[in-house]
From Swiss-Prot:
PROSITE patterns: ASP_PROTEASE, PEPTIDASE_A1. Keywords: Aspartyl protease, Disulfide bond, Glycoprotein, Hydrolase, Protease, Secreted, Signal. Residues 1-15 form the signal peptide. Aspartic proteinase. One of its GO terms (molecular function) is aspartic-type endopeptidase activity. This is Aspartic protease 17. Coiled coil: none annotated.
Length: 391
């Protein structure tokens, strides 16, 4: 463990540090439940998974965080998921006019699709791409173009996917594509991920993510900040606990132990930090122990664990030991009101089937809302700092 205090503010005053706001989609589950469409969504989702093999691990089936980008010359605006669990960038092809590319009408979101014919800087490659995510497939063809991140930050000749086929998970989310922030080894088709093309423009090869507290499930809005080239000293504590990465694919590292209530488990676990996953994913073997400690019950119809909403503030902390330091997650963060009946709330923890050298835990937005995550590319490490919130 390395505990570092950020007393070196001067280097972050240059123009090579860029802070850009993020926005939340709100809870997809809540929207589908409210519309009476969630069971239909689950059936379609299961059918799509039967004959696929996943590579990037992110799960976009609930709340996700987006950044505003532009692609092309002149620039065309798109809202992309900021995803540390995958490494590719893709946008939706304007020529794709089916229901999945156009998006679910109930999302109240008009898709911003990319029209390659209107970009003078677009160059099409003679290559197709196909990416199977944790829950959802997208495919199309590859090309290069200019990508704007905001604040004058631009990547020229970024290789990206132009998607003309999407699965249901992407169809129902109010988003226009993915901006992958993982390592090159995870990239499909051996493309260079955006962050690797961005590094030369930054003070230091670092980016940090701060997500604001969860908002009412039915609303989206401004909900965080991503800082390229430095650490968000306004929204994050000065004390940062760093741990080395165990693999430069995902942002993967070792966790020393986990505890909730009277249950504890110690010993190394492979964990990843994933801004593209809404919840925390835990090993199957531990899910029952977590459910026991929180008095959660399995909701067969909605395929989630639930607890009484009245216990949202009184449940035990989820305590993660990382780099010798304790990182408790309060129950107000991992118990979510998504509009279920009978005063029930969702336990924002899902099972993960681990194998080989991959992760056995995923720390998604539930964890990141409580702790700023600092992604240090240059030193192949990840850091965690207490997040500041106004309420």
């Amino acid at each position: 463990m390395h505990l570092i205090f950020l007393l070196f503010l001067a280097p972050f005053c240059s123009a090579a540090v860029f802070q850009l706001p993020t926005k939340s989609t709100g809870s997809l589950r809540a929207k589908l439940i409210r519309a009476g469409k969630y069971q239909e969504f689950l059936i379609t989702q299961h059918a799509a998974r039967l004959n696929t093999i996943s590579q990037p691990i992110s799960d976009y089936s609930d709340e996700v965080y987006l950044g505003n980008f532009t692609v092309g010359t002149p620039p065309q605006p798109v809202s992309l998921v900021l995803d540390t669990g995958s490494a590719n960038m893709w946008v939706i092809d304007a020529s794709c006019d089916n229901m999945f590319c156009n998006g679910w009408i109930g999302s109240n979101y008009t898709r911003q699709k990319f029209d390659t014919s209107k970009s003078s800087s677009f160059s099409r490659e003679n290559r197709k791409f196909s990416i199977q995510y944790g829950k959802g497939l997208c495919s199309g063809y590859l090309g290069t173009d200019t990508v704007g991140l905001g604040g004058g930050l631009t990547i020229r000749k970024q290789e990206l996917g132009i998607a003309n086929k999407l699965d249901v998970d992407f169809a129902v989310q109010p988003m226009d594509g993915i901006f992958g922030l993982a390592w090159p080894a995870l990239a499909v088709d051996q493309i260079t991920p955006p962050m690797q093309n961005l590094i030369s423009q930054l003070d230091v090869p670092v980016f940090s993510v701060w997500l604001d507290r969860k908002i009412q499930a039915s609303h989206g809005g401004s909900a965080g900040m991503i800082t390229y080239g430095g650490i968000d000293t306004k929204n994050c504590d000065a004390g940062v606990t760093y741990v080395p990465l165990t693999a430069k694919t995902y942002w993967q590292f070792k966790m020393d132990g986990f505890a909730v209530g009277t249950y504890s488990q110690y010993g190394y676990n492979q964990v990843i930090s994933d801004t593209g996953s809404s919840w925390i994913s835990a090993p199957y073997a531990m899910i029952n122990d977590i459910a026991t400690q929180t008095h959660a019950t399995w909701d067969e119809m909605n395929e989630i664990y639930t607890v009484k909403c009245s216990t949202m503030k009184t449940q035990p902390d989820l305590v993660f030991t990382i780099g010798g330091a304790l990182f408790p997650v309060k129950s107000v963060e991992y118990i979510l009101d998504i509009g279920l009946d009978e005063g029930k709330c969702a336990l924002a923890i899902s099972p993960l089937m681990a194998s080989g050298f991959g992760p056995s835990w995923i720390l998604g937005d539930v964890f990141i809302r409580q702790y700023c995550n600092i992604y240090d590319i240059g030193n192949a490490r990840i850091g965690f700092a207490n997040a500041h919130h106004s309420f």
